A protein has these predicted regions:
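Class I SAM-dependent methyltransferase SAM-binding "motif I" and its flanking Rossmann-like core
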Residues: 70-131
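RNA substrate-binding interface of SAM-dependent RNA methyltransferases
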Residues: 6-9, 13-24, 91-100, 105-106, ...
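Class I S-adenosyl-L-methionine
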Residues: 2-85, 93
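Short beta-strands and strand-loop turn motifs
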Residues: 53-58, 104, 108-109, 132, ...
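Amphipathic alpha-helical transducer elements in NTP-driven molecular machines
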Residues: 12, 40, 88, 118-125, ...
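Short, well-ordered secondary-structure micro-motifs
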Residues: 41, 66, 94-96, 147-149, ...
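A contiguous loop/helix-start segment that scaffolds small-molecule binding in enzyme catalytic cores
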Residues: 51-52, 133-134, 138-175
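Short hydrophobic/aromatic-enriched beta-strand-loop microsegments
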Residues: 25-33, 82-83, 102-109, 157-163
């Protein structure tokens, strides 16, 4: 992060703590769900000018249920090469800690919220009833009870591993 000219961060308030800890003075700009399209245009323009940019997220891997997909898409369309530093996405970390079968799995990211799109949520849950592979989902804490209830109704007595705060101080796994 010291070697790039600009850091695009999901939440600059969060990322500044990490940068300060390591005394990294690289300028930052925000890149998140709510500005991803217009900010990607800006970042692609900067890349065309020869600016080296790193994209970081609060946790996990950019583009895997975190901002990044739009920027990579626009870079590809502009013929700009993108590289990724290997590191675990939360879904892979959770899978490896779950105790569930890891050979074949299905990653669904976040289910649509009931409030936003109840029919689409139910359609996905109905599809998951037929899924035999280990299923990985993300969920926000304030939706967790409702989602677990819906999963129990849709999937029955299927084994579950609930992982939270992975790689952080309060990491926990419940099976």
């Amino acid at each position: 992060l010291r070697e790039v000219d600009l850091i695009a961060a999901e939440d600059t308030r969060h990322s500044i703590k990490l940068l300060n800890h390591f005394d990294i003075k690289t300028p930052m700009t925000s890149y998140h769900e709510y500005n991803k399209v217009e900010k990607a245009v800006y970042l692609v323009d900067k890349l065309r000018e020869g600016v080296n940019i790193a994209l970081i997220t609060d946790a996990g891997t950019p583009g895997i249920s975190d901002p990044g997909e739009e920027l990579v898409r626009q870079c590809a369309a502009a013929g700009i090469e993108v590289t990724s530093l290997p590191g675990p996405a939360a879904c892979i970390t959770a899978l490896s800690m779950s105790g569930l079968p890891t050979r074949r799995f299905c990653f669904e990211a976040f289910l649509p919220s009931e409030r936003a799109d109840k029919k689409e949520r139910q359609r996905i849950l109905d599809e998951l009833k037929r899924e035999t592979r280990t299923i990985i989902l993300y969920e926000a804490p304030h939706h967790l009870v409702g989602t677990l209830t819906d999963l129990r109704e849709a999937l029955g007595n299927r084994p579950v591993s609930l992982c939270r705060e992975l790689t952080k101080r309060y990491e926990s796994v419940m099976r």
